[in-house]
Amino acid sequence: MKLVEVKHPLVKHKLGLMRAADISTKNFRELATEVGSLLTYEATSDLETEKVIIDGWCGDVEIDRIKGKKVTVVPILRAGLGMMDGVLEHIPSARISVVGMYRNEETLEPVPYFQKLASDLEERLAIVVDPMLATGGSMIATIDLLKQKGCKQIKVLVLVAAPEGIKALEAAHPDIEVYTASIDSHLNEQGYIVPGLGDAGDKIFGTK
């Protein structure tokens, strides 16, 4: 599994702001979008381009254009919605495939409750977004579903990742790529990432 910890100064600065205990919903939400955008920039750096001739203001102009790549953004509900716009800033024509997962707080296992996916997943690069890669259970279940529907190329964007989740995801899906703003220390007894961001979903949506 390809794992990239994006160490750009802007990413580190913005993620650091998100770790503050007293951060407002507005600021957390905006920063989640901004970091998601920067991760997207990194994750799409290997997209293949081709030369195309277009009509320019002074005649024919040769330009580079992304070559035949269809993309679907896959936010894992609900917190993944907070990163979705960051991807769409760069790929506004991407289809949106939604997967609903929540974590059973007693067993820490993922529980699926909703899915609405692009009809042609076998032709698309899927960019899965979720702020936290903790135990890895929800991400593994989501990728299982995408592969069952025919998706062949999958990239994952997360704000923070725990070593435990990385290990589990690599064991289940060694063929994917993961881009994160930080590999944090560990999971606590409640399954939260330390130092992490707290409950990203609550902070994005202003709920408790």
Curated annotation (Swiss-Prot):
One Gene Ontology MF term: uracil phosphoribosyltransferase activity
Cofactor note (record): Binds 1 Mg(2+) ion per subunit. The magnesium is bound as Mg-PRPP.
Positions with a binding annotation for uracil: 193, 198-200
Domain of life: Bacteria
Cofactor requirements of the protein: Mg(2+)
Gene3D superfamilies: 3.40.50.2020
Top EC class of this enzyme: transferase
Family annotation (InterPro entries): PRibTrfase_dom, PRTase-like, Upp_B, UPRTase/APRTase, Ura_phspho_trans
EC code(s) of this entry: 2.4.2.9
Residues annotated as binding 5-phospho-alpha-D-ribose 1-diphosphate: 78, 103, 130-138, 199
Pfam family name, one: UPRTase
The family this protein is said to belong to: Belongs to the UPRTase family.
Protein's recorded name: Uracil phosphoribosyltransferase
